[in-house]
């Protein structure tokens, strides 16, 4: 049965671009977002006809753009990365910062939790990758064979059988690091422009990367090789695998593309109706993506400060 995505509603509350989105399996009615307005918002999702949800709590503390956010697997904590050079660990029930992570010497662009929530990895414009414990202690800084430009994205593999960290950089490289030794395992070479994002499939077997060259490259993390590429035809800002379908979603400068990885074809392309923009201004772009845990809703954060929720439906 062919499927498509339909716009279900919007979430409005940020006063800056929505830079990152995170969902929780433990709390399906919660969405977390980060923004250039220096805050994170915890949303309560109601999915009503009139309103898709409302801001339950605003997380304040960062003194600059918040670039990335993730939720712990138990749904109790969130991590945020900021251009103020720090990370913060938040208790979601109270909205308080429980730890600040200080050590990067430039904007922090990305943060990720390990599968057991005991380790944290961050990537920065200082070109380093740092490993932390949840107490805020930096346990290791990866610089040897590291990125020669900004580290744009870092992600832990969810697969305990192959414990690796994947990173991407403005040096056009995807790097795979062995978690046990923090040593470089593989350099994945192929992109012709800076890379904005990497994402790992739910089973940890696949990694996808994308950026300036408009190509999504898929890598086999178990075999350490390039599998194939999918053309998005425009700069890629964000990538996310579906939790329950063999799909990869790409947020590009012009639309959101849903790829079927089995057929290597487009399932759908999402472009909301934007209010008319002047000749000089650009249409809003999607720069962040997250699936609901059940894979039925795709959340998309835009440069018009709005989060849009798309629902998977069967094509009539």
UniProtKB/Swiss-Prot annotation:
What is this protein's record name?
MST50-interacting protein 11
Q: What does the subunit comment say?
A: Interacts with MST50 and MCK1.
User: According to its record, what are the GO cellular component terms?
Assistant: cytosolic small ribosomal subunit
Q: Name one GO biological process term.
A: GCN2-mediated signaling
Q: Which organism is it from?
A: Pyricularia oryzae (strain 70-15 / ATCC MYA-4617 / FGSC 8958) (Rice blast fungus)
Homology family: Belongs to the WD repeat G protein beta family. Ribosomal protein RACK1 subfamily.
Record bears the keyword Repeat: yes
Map the WD repeats onto residue numbers: 13-53, 61-100, 103-142, 146-187, 190-229, 231-269, 281-316
Its domain of life reads Eukaryota
């Amino acid at each position: 049965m062919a499927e498509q995505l339909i716009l279900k509603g919007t979430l409005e509350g940020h006063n800056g671009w929505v830079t990152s989105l995170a969902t929780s399996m433990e709390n399906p009615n919660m969405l977390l977002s980060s923004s250039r307005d220096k805050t994170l918002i915890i949303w309560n999702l109601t999915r009503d006809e009139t309103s898709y949800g409302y801001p339950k709590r605003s997380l304040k503390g960062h003194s600059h753009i918040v670039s990335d956010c993730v939720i712990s697997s138990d749904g109790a904590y969130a991590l945020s990365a900021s251009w103020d050079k720090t990370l913060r660990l938040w208790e979601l029930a109270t909205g308080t910062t429980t730890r600040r992570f200080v050590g990067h010497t430039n904007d922090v662009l990305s943060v990720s939790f390990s599968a057991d929530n005991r380790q944290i990895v961050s990537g920065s414009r200082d070109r380093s990758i740092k490993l932390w414990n949840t107490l805020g202690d930096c346990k290791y800084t990866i610089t040897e064979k590291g990125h020669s430009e900004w580290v744009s994205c870092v992600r832990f593999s969810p697969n305990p059988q192959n414990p690796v960290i994947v990173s991407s950089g403005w040096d056009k490289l995807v790097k795979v690091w062995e978690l046990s030794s923090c040593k470089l395992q593989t350099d994945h070479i192929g992109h012709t422009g800076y890379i904005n994002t990497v994402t790992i499939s739910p089973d940890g077997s696949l990694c996808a990367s994308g950026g300036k060259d408009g190509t999504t490259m898929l890598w086999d993390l178990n075999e350490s090789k390039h599998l194939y590429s999918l053309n998005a035809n425009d700069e890629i800002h964000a990538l996310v695998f579906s939790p329950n379908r063999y799909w990869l979603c790409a947020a590009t400068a012009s639309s959101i593309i849903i790829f079927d990885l089995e057929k290597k074809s487009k399932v759908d392309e999402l472009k909301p109706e934007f209010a008319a923009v002047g000749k000089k201004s650009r249409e809003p772009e999607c720069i962040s993506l997250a699936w609901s845990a059940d894979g039925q809703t795709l959340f998309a954060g835009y440069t018009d400060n709005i989060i849009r929720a798309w629902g998977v439906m069967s094509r009539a």
